[in-house]
Structures are given as structure tokens and as C-alpha cells.
Amino acid sequence: MKSIKIKCPAKLNLTLEVVNKREDGFHNINSIMQLISLYDYLAISVYKAEKTSIELSGNSNEIPYNEKNLVYKAAELFLKKTGLKNFNIKINIEKNIPIAAGLAGGSTDGAGTILGLNLLFDNILSEIKMHELCAMLGSDLNVCLKGGCLHATSRGENVRKLPVKIYPVTLIKPKNLGISAKEAYTKYAMKKDKPKYYMTERMIEALKQDKDIKEFLYNDLEYAVFDDYKELQQIKSKLPKSIMSGSGSTYFILEDVKNIDFSDDYQIIKNIRFITDGCSEV
């Protein structure tokens, strides 16, 4: 039996600009994504067995522990692509990243699974191959695997490193509101007026020159869903400098906010920072 523990960081979209809809139903985006110090943890164990099996467990009752979970899909794909057989893989998921929040909680766990299994099997896959598997599983996995600050294009799976400028972060999420990517992109497509601010390019230049990036925070999907949810309007009214991450419903502000006057209907996560790495062994 071999075991490993992997920490899987959440991500923020510092910018998210929708370019167009693709023939495969996904959207091409232009986005800057930043990993932050909010982590899920995976405890992965591998046993020799008469037949191959994958078992999931965890601390959250909000996620499935079966083949519908991206962790399961990642383990299954890893075994298929490596040709490994007759192993029992057990993965315990310690969930700390909010669900359906625009923070890539599922994607980072999937990326962490690929990394952890590859380490347990003596780096059977190259870094390039790991990224290929991550791209097959979803749009945000490569960001979570590579880590730091990244310029993401295509549907989000094509990434290149950018300089990291460290900021404190406060997260605010309506507890009872999750917005699916499908809903957000559909509503964006229905908008007749789609302003173009080219914030991604402007933020890239600011990062390269080590300048403040706060004025360039932007999300097309916030524009798409904001008018439909009073919970989002409440956040923005109290924290005008905050911005939505991904398809929501989490908002973030690049400050250590000491006193936040929100009801118990909101989850507040403080003492978070930008980080320079991605999924990694604990």
C-alpha cells in the first residue's frame, strides 16, 4: 500500500471575458486566473488487488462519492491512459472550497487526483501528458495543476504563466445560491449589449510592470446574471469594489476586510492570499 496527501487550491477569475461560442458548445474565453490559499485536501491510497476499483469518501454531503465526481473520473482516466490494472484506489476528499461557487473546487480536486496518482506511480506520466489528461476532464484543471497566475484562453485549458502580485483576499458567498456555468453563459448570450473593455490585456500589462491590478478586475458573467439575483446585488452594494469569480456565486475583494455586515445567509472566508503554486503534495 502507498499513500499520499495532496492540497488542491481554489482559483479566482481576476478577469473573465467571453470571446465567442464554439461548435462543441463551450465558449472561448480570455481570462486571468489566480490560485489562492483556500484548499481541499485529498488523501490517496493505492493497494494491489485482484481487480481494479475506485472508492471515494469525504466530509461533505454536498458532493457525490461515485462515478459522477470529477475525482473518480480523473482516477479512471489516469488508469485507462497508463494501462495500470489490478489496483484498488481509495481517495478521501476533505472539502473546504464552497460548492458551485465559481472557485474551481471540483476542477482542482480532479487535477490533484492526476498529480497524486502520478506521484504514487513514480511519475509514469510527463508533465505534458498530465496536462493533456486535465484538458480532457475539464476547462479549469490545467490552471489548478500549473498554479500561480495564468492567462487562460480557448475554453480555459490553454494556459501560460504570468507574474504573481500578492494580494490579500476576502471571499463572500451567498450560502443558498449556486449559479451553473450553463445558466451564466446562456444569459450572457441573450444580452444584446455586450461591452468590450479588454481588461485581460490591460491587466497582463499591469502585472508585467508590477502595477496595481484592482482597477482591471472584470467578469462578463457577472454582467450576465447580476440583475437576476438580489443576493449578488446585496454584496455589491456593501462592497462596491468586489467582483464575481467564474460563473458565481462567490464574490471576492482584494483586501483583508475586517468588519463585514452580512447576515448568516452569507459565507465569509477571510485570511486568504494569492499563491504562486498549484496542486501539490502536503
Protein language model regions, located:
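ATP-binding N-lobe of GHMP and related small-molecule kinases
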Residues: 1-101, 118-131, 153, 164, ...
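Residue-level signal for inorganic ion chemistry
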Residues: 14, 42-44, 71, 106, ...
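Short beta-strand scaffold segments in enzyme catalytic cores
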Residues: 16, 40-44, 140-144, 150, ...
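Gly/Ser/Thr-rich beta-alpha loop segments that engage phosphate groups in nucleotides
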Residues: 17, 27, 71, 102-108, ...
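Short, basic/glycine-rich phosphate-binding loops at helix/coil junctions
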Residues: 50-64, 113, 208-218
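Glycine/serine-rich anion-binding loops at beta->alpha junctions
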Residues: 92-121, 139, 241-253
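RNase III-family endoribonuclease catalytic core
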Residues: 112, 118-162
